[in-house]
Amino acid sequence: MVLLAAAVCTKAGKAIVSRQFVEMTRTRIEGLLAAFPKLMNTGKQHTFVETESVRYVYQPMEKLYMVLITTKNSNILEDLETLRLFSRVIPEYCRALEENEISEHCFDLIFAFDEIVALGYRENVNLAQIRTFTEMDSHEEKVFRAVRETQEREAKAEMRRKAKELQQARRDAERQGKKAPGFGGFGSSTVSGGSTTSMITETIIETDKPKVAPAPARPSGPSKALKLGAKGKEVDNFVDKLKSEGENIISSNMGKRTSEATKVHAPPINMESVHMKIEEKITLTCGRDGGLQNMELHGMIMLRISDDKFGRIRLHVENEDKKGVQLQTHPNVDKKLFTAESLIGLKNPEKSFPVNSDVGVLKWRLQTTEESFIPLTINCWPSESGNGCDVNIEYELQEDNLELNDVVITIPLPSGVGAPVIGEIDGEYRHDSRRNTLEWCLPVIDAKNKSGSLEFSIAGQPNDFFPVQVSFISKKNYCNIQVTKVTQVDGNSPVRFSTETTFLVDKYEIL
């Protein structure tokens, strides 16, 4: 048996993914696949067709074909057995036998095809072996990773212990009326998650560099951020110890890229034929001395129906809001029905909702100056010292039912004074020298982690650290409004539906 190519194509002969096992040009394989639909005889139940030069062995898969192109003298029974294995491989990687899904997983399919056939000849493998080979599962790699994770945990514990010692030394020095030595960025050792490398690199603060790159390295003058005082030797010894345990100490920019690359994206929503998107956006302005100047929140329920048989439905809305939200339905929605029974349905029950389009059926608005309504309070306390400012920032979650993700608190910094010296910190930080900002990053703020603080020192005046800006995203909405049930107008039978909830920031400032 000599297998020339394996391909998944449409019924019109358009190639979606194709793997050639012998040398063959793209024009040649596209021509063979384009000719394939014209050769099939719908009146016969054969699963192969032949031309003067090649044989097509195929299997229909809904709107697609799995096609093997072989030489004419190949064993047709072996070809059919190989075709069945190819057809079983595709559902392993694709959730649906559709063109978009095949294209999205084309490389996974090609890797699997290569495990089945090598140089035109069938390999003696089964489906389980193909799955194992493509996953490249290795016991040695698992052992190595386990050892690596243990070393990282030990290094983090050592860093936390060292940070506490340095912080205690600083407090003792302040009690005695002495200036505490700068401790660099070791406060960032309390970071949760991410690689150890990204945490350690924050302790290495770059000095101001000359603008001319090719010039020989020259000292640019002492930098306050590098004055580690009597503790400098201990810091160097600690970094050397981490290196001996297998840690790579790299530049701070590389560390930032590493920590950013490790962010895990949320999995895609599994959308049903009836899908609802609940979205809220908040605009908030607070004063630095306390007091809510303005808070405005806008929310909306967007309905999307992808199957016209579910066009005539009603949404059961549960409103547990106690903050005085103003609700407004779409003009085509029966307002009396919503007011009396909290049901969203069309005024004319014989009509259907639009299909394959997002329709806003309910929106709400909340505007207030009540401080107790602030979801996340931020207190920034800059105090002038002899060499600049000591800044303390605290956050506290006031809405315990919320879970805020990817929280970033951005503090402006004065320009031309170098990097800040970080003391205590919950979470991690990034210093953007181009935009002169310090970003305090917290992966999650919830009822278990509802408060935290950041301390840093830098030259400047108290007004230099405002306005403080906040951004976050949440999968729980602020105004507890949910769709609990969807039923059809006729028969009141329940309908499966999916919901996607997002609560995000439009503008969140402390002036």
Curated annotation (Swiss-Prot):
The keyword RNA-binding does not apply. Keywords: Acetylation, Cytoplasm, Cytoplasmic vesicle, ER-Golgi transport, Golgi apparatus, Membrane, Phosphoprotein, Protein transport, Transport. It is found in: Cytoplasm; Golgi apparatus membrane; Cytoplasmic vesicle, COPI-coated vesicle membrane. The keyword Transport applies. Residues 271-511 form the MHD domain. It is a peripheral membrane protein. CDD domains: AP_delta-COPI_MHD, Delta_COP_N. GO terms for biological process: adult locomotory behavior; cerebellar Purkinje cell layer maturation; endoplasmic reticulum to Golgi vesicle-mediated transport; Golgi localization; intra-Golgi vesicle-mediated transport; pigmentation; protein transport; retrograde vesicle-mediated transport, Golgi to endoplasmic reticulum. Ubiquitously expressed. Residues 168-196 are annotated as: Disordered. GO terms for cellular component: COPI vesicle coat; endoplasmic reticulum; Golgi membrane. Residues 168-177 have a biased composition (Basic and acidic residues). The modification N6-acetyllysine is found at K233, K241, K309, K351. Belongs to the adaptor complexes medium subunit family. Delta-COP subfamily. Oligomeric complex that consists of at least the alpha, beta, beta', gamma, delta, epsilon and zeta subunits. The coatomer is a cytosolic protein complex that binds to dilysine motifs and reversibly associates with Golgi non-clathrin-coated vesicles, which further mediate biosynthetic protein transport from the ER, via the Golgi up to the trans Golgi network. Coatomer complex is required for budding from Golgi membranes, and is essential for the retrograde Golgi-to-ER transport of dilysine-tagged proteins. This is Coatomer subunit delta. It comes from Bos taurus (Bovine). The gene is ARCN1.
